[in-house]
């Protein structure tokens, strides 16, 4: 089973690359962002809570996110593997994911970290806001999300570096070049 986490700051292109990876390797795509946006669009109680938190540029609790992931994994039994997109975001989430996968005998094969300079990330996110109208793509929320990423999320990379499954990919180039670098990394970890 091929379990991979796609990692990087907001606006790095994780969603774009995830679609291509899922298609090529036939993995179940577990995107916390998609799951949360679905809850918001459907107007569920969880969605209303999430919408308020996200609009403030804050990150949802580990418990909230882990519950979404566990429910989704349970719905995808018998797949070739999972592509985790937007998860784990904290070391606590990484440790929970490690335990969940090890319990199944299928540990995480790689954390693929997409690197893009801050100014390019900001430009991408503001452009995306014009197109998609996402509430979390305004200047104030963007700045807060980057602080959160730098304060908490970047420690996840260190967690997986210690395990020897962290892979860096340059993301400030055309989509196909990024995908080729990711594909090469996946082939080496299989």
Residue ranges: model-predicted function:
Residues 1-190:
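Glycine-rich phosphate-binding loop of ATP-dependent small-molecule kinases
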